[in-house]
From Swiss-Prot:
Entry keyword set: ATP-binding, Cytoplasm, DNA damage, DNA excision, DNA repair, Excision nuclease, Nucleotide-binding, SOS response
Location of the UVR domain: 622-657
Main location group: cytoplasm
Subunit structure: Forms a heterotetramer with UvrA during the search for lesions. Interacts with UvrC in an incision complex.
Domain of life: Bacteria
InterPro entries: Helicase/UvrB_N, Helicase_ATP-bd, Helicase_C-like, P-loop_NTPase, UVR_dom, UVR_dom_sf, UvrB, UvrB_inter
UniProt-recorded name of the protein: UvrABC system protein B
Gene Ontology molecular function: any one: ATP hydrolysis activity
Domain annotation Helicase C-terminal: ranges: 429-595
Residue numbers covered by motif Beta-hairpin: 91-114
Subcellular location, record wording: Cytoplasm
Amino acid sequence: MIDFFLNSEYLPAGDQPKAIKEIENSILLGNKYQTLKGVTGSGKTFTIANIIKDLNRPALVVSHNKTLAAQLYREFKDFFPNNAVEYFVSYYDYYQPESYVPSKDLFIEKEATINTEIEIKRIRTVTSLAKRRDVIVVATVSSIYALGSPDFFKKSAREFSVGQKISIKEISDIFVELYYERTLMNLERDKFSIKGNIIEIWPSSEHGEFAYRICLDFDEIVEIYRISSFSKKNLGTTNSFTLFAKSYFVIPYKNVLEAIPKISYDLNLQCQYFKDNGKLVEAERLKQRVEYDLEMLRETGFCSGIENYSKYLSGSEMERPYCLFDFFPKDYLLFVDESHVTLPQFRGMYNGDYSRKLNLVNFGFRLPAALENRPLKYDEFDALINQVVFVSATPGLEENLKSRVVVDQIIRPTGLVDPEIITRHSDGQMEDLYSEIQKRVALKERVLITTLTKKMSEDLTEYLVSLGVRAKYLHSELDTLERVEVISLLRKSEIDVIVGINLLREGLDIPEVSLVAILDADKVGFLRSTTSLIQTIGRAARNSNGLVIMYYDTISVAMREAIEETNRRRQIQVDYNKKNNITPKTIVKKIQNILEKELNNKNKNINYDLEKIISGERLSKKKLINKLKFELEEAVNDERFEDAIVLRDKIKELSSKISVARNK
């Protein structure tokens, strides 16, 4: 077994050593629940990495959105370059679920656009879990949605090795059995080609880097090469490789044959139920739809919406569907990042899905078994937990009640302390805010201002600009690239102020920000709860001059609690710094991260591919643009804003050159 190797030039510091030790001791004692209560900027991710390394167990890290999950994924990839760090999030760029609106008698067909690159990462995730133990998976709520049987997937593995006695036809049959398709054209992902005594395959779990070439002589494998997927260049030989099914929804054909009579039986029962209750339209509708699906299953082993029959096809007697958790070994560790947000999100997934599908069942669009293709109920999710560490600066009631151990991580390795908080009455707040902005601009520092509505953020930005302040607003109506550019402008000092609404959702941890101004801090609601206020205060915790100003009419309970908790932490941090003679220093974060060698190589390949495209060779326009768009999304999620803008420009350049080439 390969051990986890943590790659870092730093050792745990501040409260990290204590937190690591206490969490590890709790886990080794067999406690199921523990909480890491770490302030913003205290290095919670590094603490998690050390726990994984020390306990040497597979780990699942779940976050509440794709952006934060991508940031964690990049950090863990850097921490563990020699281990399998995988990424498992929803692969839909667009998703309109199948639904029925009774009031309008409107049936809406399922529509979806799948992100191929994300799908590859998902397949790589289950492949890694099937092959090895040194695996860290960073995931979102997708981790509790239905997947195929882990046993079927693991049993799909086929090994090919030099010296193996096997014919081209036998290899071809195995590939087809694993859902790969033969192509007579250029090799593509999920396909294989045969030319004489050579067979090539591009595994679904490979990220485009390479494929395999198997050379045979008299029904014996004599050589296996790793080759470039696009150029077919030889990348070296290997003695063997293992191939898994191209999808984690592996359904043996015998299961399909066994499922058909069960589906027919339930169809008759449900149709009879509709007829007995005078629902003749529903009975006829269901009969037509399911009989068509059954015919497709008999002929091809597949049908549209096959996931709605997963209860019959899985061969499992379980009352819940399989999910990502089932692919992990029993001793895995779960880390729930930002647990105060993530746990409520997990809790709410089942009910929304159930109510939508219940309409489909009640009105004859689906069999009742379709209700079993669903996310886990919260108690099912909880039952699948082996041992968990909840991670949050502001853990909720559930984490505090369940955890046998709650560990504070208050002291930052940088010596930075929580910001000072000043409360000011809202009378004359605009003039006061303008004055404070001017002070920060003079020091070449930045300002974040949080409002309650989009209209307020736009109006305030317009007002500040009219006074000569370099300001931009930031909210959900801006697309990804526009948000990227606004943040990039702030970091490069081309603007001094960002006015936003939910700055937590934007994931704004910008060390240049020394002032956070909270307007209407006393208003009751989600954005001004104790938890949200503490999290917002943390936006100023990465600068040694951090200051928070709360503008109010009447000091609210949430304000008082947030101020008291922040002051408690601040005092502990100040006392520690005095005792250890530490001078806090603002975090230095490069404005433009120099691209790693890997990305530089990719960019060189991009230029090469542009020429290939223009001359009509190799990679198609659609594939290359999709590849660049995926890299753009990764750059945005990693906060590599300069890289994102470069990639955006390359996409525009490619589209332009293709257009010119076609017009010649």
